Swiss-Prot record:
It is found in: Plastid, Chloroplast. It is an enzyme of class 1 (oxidoreductase). The keyword ATP-binding does not apply. Pfam families: DXP_redisom_C, DXP_reductoisom, DXPR_C. GO terms for cellular component: chloroplast. Keywords: Chloroplast, Isoprene biosynthesis, Manganese, Metal-binding, NADP, Oxidoreductase, Plastid, Transit peptide. HAMAP family: DXP_reductoisom. This is 1-deoxy-D-xylulose 5-phosphate reductoisomerase, chloroplastic. It comes from the Eukaryota. It catalyses: 2-C-methyl-D-erythritol 4-phosphate + NADP(+) = 1-deoxy-D-xylulose 5-phosphate + NADPH + H(+). It comes from Mentha piperita. GO terms for biological process: isopentenyl diphosphate biosynthetic process, methylerythritol 4-phosphate pathway involved in terpenoid biosynthetic process.
Length: 470
């Protein structure tokens, strides 16, 4: 491909003062037009490679099935990514509720010191570390510990943790496509999934969802937005869901004029107004790519059409998302911005567990404001890209996610500018059109995830913030 400038994203050209966004168009006719109603300018895409959507995890409503409780005592749980943010918060919940939950297996990366502390505290039967070289270090850290677990390294170790015979629910807290194979193994073993790994659905939805249906596995969302939707659809009658409304904080630049975006630095993007999160997700909040990816997740989880999934800016992050029913009623889930609540609900569902207000502050609505505004498609072109990729389906959604992950990595490393993130993602998706797999296998999903990262890495900044391929 020759060096390319995306002229349709006009605000990327610093020489222009008019910031109207023309309809985006990928080369070769990958275009969409807008409708004017709703909180976002929803898009209709015309693309020859449009796949039939896989069966949703929760088709617009949620009911517990009688007889699913097959264990005695505390629910047995495996955790993939135990030393990460989701994993440590999960273990905090287990420690606070030993009569409700117990840990049977843990998979971690290379933080052996923390993993050893977790093993001593929760006494799992099986643990996994990133590679074989860490086994001796872990054994040394556990010297003298009586309840020494079995230790299996690498990807196979994660898979064994995921399908441990005693586990009922598997928490998938690992980032990226590395979490896809263990999730598939857990589903094939009949384990319910507490899903905190976005790639499982965004990249793997066309493969994972039919598999979950085949094995009668429940996929329970552990992120705040989809947990909110899941909570709102409890008990809804069939066909009652009309619209999904995803709330977004707006990120670090929600109040910054569009013309100032070309000047922002990495440190600016990492100043989230509400949440304390990792670097990648904080940048995703600034670009609103996190919300675009959540639109795709909502489609796969709940079966809503893309025209019926909307985004609204809610600066306070108190309402985590909403659903509208056919009679125009709007149901919302509210709470402090605290990831522990959605994680807890994936473990306790369909039950509600009492939480002490000492460690779980209660919401006082008299002390908070609730405001909303329409998101700006010029400031956040990620929304258009996500809707287009979602409608294309197949491997395009995984390519979008992987390209964004690589672009954010390059931005954090100061190899590209903030506005180049959007260009890198669009160029990568455009290149993928010619070889997109409509109904991909697991191997194709993993292959194109890596392809997208490699291709995105070839897009470099050149004069005038216009990317060029090398």
């Amino acid at each position: 491909m020759a060096p390319t400038e995306i002229k349709t994203l006009s605000f990327l050209d610093s020489s222009k003062s008019n910031y109207n966004l023309n309809p985006l168009k990928f080369q070769g006719g990958f275009a969409f037009k807008r409708k004017d109603s709703g909180c976002t300018a929803a898009k209709r895409v015309h693309c020859s490679a449009q796949s039939q959507s896989p069966p949703p995890a929760w088709p617009g409503r949620a009911f517990p099935e009688p007889g699913r409780m097959t264990w005695e005592g505390p629910k047995p749980i495996s955790v993939i990514g135990s030393t990460g943010s989701i994993g440590t918060q999960t273990l905090d919940i287990v420690a606070e509720n030993p009569d409700k939950f117990r840990i049977v297996a843990l998979a971690a990366g290379s933080n052996v010191t923390l993993l050893a502390d977790q093993v001593k505290a929760f006494k799992p039967k099986l643990v996994s570390v990133k590679d074989e070289s860490l086994i001796s270090e872990l054994k040394e850290a556990l010297a003298g510990f009586e309840d020494m677990p079995e230790i299996i390294p690498g990807e196979q170790g994660m898979i064994e943790v995921a399908r441990h015979p005693d586990a009922v629910t598997v928490v998938t807290g690992i980032v990226g496509c590395a979490g896809l194979k263990p999730t598939v193994a857990a589903i094939e073993a009949g384990k319910d999934i507490a899903l905190a790994n976005k790639e499982t659905l965004i990249a793997g939805g066309p493969f994972v969802l039919p598999l979950a249906k085949k094995h009668n596995v429940k996929i329970l969302p552990a992120d705040s937005e989809h947990s909110a939707i899941f909570q709102c659809i409890q008990g809804l009658p069939e066909g009652a869901l009309r619209r999904i409304i995803l709330t977004a904080s707006g990120g670090a630049f929600r109040d910054l004029p569009v013309e100032k975006l070309k000047e922002v630095k990495v440190a600016d993007a990492l100043k989230h107004p509400n949440w304390n999160m990792g670097k990648k997700i904080t940048v995703d909040s600034a670009t609103l790519f996190n919300k675009g990816l959540e639109v795709i997740e909502a489609h796969y989880l709940f079966g809503a059409e893309y025209d019926d999934i909307e985004i609204v800016i809610h600066p306070q992050s108190i309402i985590h998302s909403m659903v509208e029913t056919q009679d125009s009623s709007v149901l919302a889930q509210l709470g402090w911005p605290d990831m522990r609540l959605p994680i807890l609900y994936t473990l306790s569902w369909p039950e509600r567990i009492y939480c002490s207000e000492i460690t779980w502050p209660r919401l006082d609505l008299c002390k908070v404001d609730l405001t909303f505004k329409k998101p700006d498609n010029v400031k956040y072109p990620s929304m258009d890209l996500a809707y287009a990729a979602g409608r294309a389906g197949g491997t395009m959604t995984g390519v979008l996610s992987a390209a964004n992950e690589k672009a954010v990595e390059m931005f954090i490393d100061e190899k590209i500018g903030y506005l180049d993130i959007f260009k890198v993602v669009e160029l990568t998706c455009d290149k993928h059109r010619s070889e997109m797999a409509v109904s991909p296998s697991l191997e194709e999903i993993v292959h194109y995830d890596q392809w997208a990262r490699d291709y995105a890495a070839t897009v470099l900044k050149s004069a005038g913030l216009s990317p060029a391929l090398v």
